[in-house]
């Protein structure tokens, strides 16, 4: 049976039940279980160091009030990073290639930052819709443009993550298919294609990490504007 290249992005089912919930819960197995000691082993040490580094980078643009969001933003980045990397393994499913999931993450968090600004400093939040020193004739047009720019932020967050991961998975699928097809005909070209596939896989690992960081970093910058 011939399958479409996009079939890899469909949610797998087992006995009629979607496995996306299982794929979201499996990354929790990678985290250390709580024990009597602060640090149980070397793996825990590395994980704590990475979590500290991530939290420090995300909290740099925020003031003291924004530090309340540290746990949620760090947890979100850890989840996205783990899911993106696990999705590169063979015969796995990447939930973050689904626009519905990414929008479900982006829209509520963006709305939370917006409502936080409207509650804490409404005048400053509304002032972002009109740049300082705008000529009077341009005020209506600029307010409309800034409002549109504000409203498409969650869409840009979700589409950016979906598009980057989908494009990478499609390239890996296409090059691996070409490598297998060329093996009996042109073995040398097939080997070169496999080398390109290896380099592309390394690049996709970097993209998976960068996109998780960019998603959460943009949320922290939106939060900075409203705190």
From Swiss-Prot:
Keyword Membrane among UniProt keywords: yes
Cited SUPFAM superfamilies: F1F0 ATP synthase subunit A (SSF81336)
Highest taxon above the source species: Eukaryota
GO molecular function: proton channel activity; proton-transporting ATP synthase activity, rotational mechanism
Subcellular compartments: Mitochondrion inner membrane
Transmembrane spans: 14-34, 69-89, 98-118, 139-159, 167-187, 190-210
Keyword Membrane: yes
Biological processes annotated in GO: proton motive force-driven ATP synthesis; proton transmembrane transport
Gene Ontology CC: mitochondrial inner membrane; proton-transporting ATP synthase complex
Predominant place of localization: mitochondrion
Keywords noted in UniProt: ATP synthesis, CF(0), Hydrogen ion transport, Ion transport, Membrane, Mitochondrion, Mitochondrion inner membrane, Transmembrane, Transmembrane helix, Transport
UniProt subunit comment: Component of the ATP synthase complex composed at least of ATP5F1A/subunit alpha, ATP5F1B/subunit beta, ATP5MC1/subunit c (homooctomer), MT-ATP6/subunit a, MT-ATP8/subunit 8, ATP5ME/subunit e, ATP5MF/subunit f, ATP5MG/subunit g, ATP5MK/subunit k, ATP5MJ/subunit j, ATP5F1C/subunit gamma, ATP5F1D/subunit delta, ATP5F1E/subunit epsilon, ATP5PF/subunit F6, ATP5PB/subunit b, ATP5PD/subunit d, ATP5PO/subunit OSCP.
Record-stated family: Belongs to the ATPase A chain family.
The protein's name: ATP synthase F(0) complex subunit a
Source organism (scientific name): Anas platyrhynchos
